Amino acid sequence: MATRTEAAGSPTKARIVLLALAAGQFLMALDSSVMNVSIATVAEDVGTTVTGVQGAITAYTLVMAMFMIPGGKVGALIGRKRAFMIGCIIYGFGSLTTALAPNLPVLLLGWSFLEGVGAALILPAIVALVASNFPAERRAAAYGLVAAAGAVAIAVGPLVGGVATTYFSWRWVFVGEVVMVLGILLLAGRIADAPVGERPRIDLVGALLSALGLGVFVYGVLRSDEWGWFQPKPDAPSWLGVSLVVWLMLAGLLLIWLFLRWEARMVRRRREPLVDPAMLRNRQLTGGLTMFFFQYLVQMGVFFVVPLYLSVALGLSALKTGARILPLSVTLLAAAVLIPRLLPDVSPRRVVRLGVLALFAGAVVLMAALDADAGAEIVTLPLLLIGLGMGALASQLGAVTVSAVPEAQSAEVGGVQNAVTNLGASIGTALAGSILIATMTTSFLTTVEENPDVPSKVKTQATVELESGVPFLSDAQLKSALDEAGTSKKVTEAALDANEKARIDGLRAALAILAFTALLSLFFTTRIPDTQPSSAKP
């Protein structure tokens, strides 16, 4: 315990520790947001298709989801600091492999597998190491900064990816990640390890059940856009007339239920569980985890919708799109840093509720501002509000979840917390995308159907084509496709008008569901403590 006091007591050491942990969180969040703007370039470079690169992104998410809870337990087995450093080394090798990848299989090995496994060790360890390096009164600020670093990475990722793709190569992003890993490892020597009790044995059956349950559930969610949530899309797999997505999600939930039953059995036999089911009966912990889920659902939904509007509807480059998203980082960092510092005794429940309302307000303001004639400037105020909400939540939720359990269980909580945020992020992106595409399809067909200038043959053909899925196209992309098809000027103009209206309708619908979800989360804030929590004693 002396090492913990020393690390927390020295301002210089505390800053170095916080820098190392925040840099780790930043690195974990940077990957996907960077690559989303570079998919086509990566596909061309490694000799594959856009679908192949999207599959690599999906695989990275799956690997993290599957190994996050076991990764938290590994930290209890070998030490949280060692797990953090080993995770960084694995992640660094993954980044180097990705930077040098000549083809898709090597990209999958480096990016999807090695980086995914590294992240599953790093993220739970960060949660435990913040708890062990900072006293209770400074923990909320530390968790806020670490969480803010991850959110800022998502916000600046498109800008970094745009700069790299435009002026250098996407490969330099991963070279930069290797350099960051080396820097983190140099700083990590100052980190005080979390206290480790008796070395537990890894529950292999529990690890398998949790990995399969989370993996199958997340895979189902990630396939929803391609296969359909309930009603299967044409040529999509189904069973009993229902999309395979439903069956995969149900199978995942069944496996997670079996996992919890198995863990309860382990406890009854006085054996070390992977996750103690008693933790999930902790009102404060489940409250914090639930709010983490909703935060990441709304947050990632917004990060899906806003770049689409800027890059496709307005035709901005990746560089300009990234620059327009940057204002979010200002209020996010300000709230995450200043709330714990200026209001150390403020009610966490009140801050969380205000943060949720800021998310809701940001989504509603953006929804109201969307218009066919609007410019990129309309996203600034909504993003400032959303950043404020994200920062407010980041300033409280980490401390709320970890302080709900003894410090010896902090890595376990870290694994569960990151699994929950992974689920929220996956569902948020998939839900926003599905609502957007479904609304676009309906709006486009309705507008075309009501237009007398469009021949009935074209209307029928459009219906058949769109039932199999509609892409989110810019006017330039649609006009090019229509010109190649040899359509008349009247039909082209009608289609462009319908596409413009459909895009706005789809974006508004996606934002509406995100705003509704934010409001829904308010009903779960009663589980957040009304006073600043202090760490539970071991």
PLM ranges: what are they?
Residues M1-L21, Q25, A264-R265, R271, ...:
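Transmembrane-helix exit segments and adjacent C-terminal regions of multi-pass membrane proteins
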Residues A8, L185-L214, W227-L240, R265-R283, ...:
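Flexible interhelical linker loops that connect adjacent transmembrane helices
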Residues V74, I78-F93, T97, A101-L109, ...:
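C-terminal module of multi-pass small-molecule transporters
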Residues V178-V196, G213-E226, A251-V267, S521-P529:
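C-terminal membrane-cytosol helix-exit motif in multi-pass small-molecule transporters
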Residues A14-M64, M68, S169, W239-L248, ...:
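Transmembrane core module of solute transporters
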Residues A76-L214, R223, P232, L240, ...:
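Helix-loop-helix hairpins in multi-pass membrane proteins, especially solute transporters
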Residues I39, A153-T165, P307, I339, ...:
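Small-residue (Gly/Pro/Ala) motifs that create kinks and tight helix-helix packing interfaces
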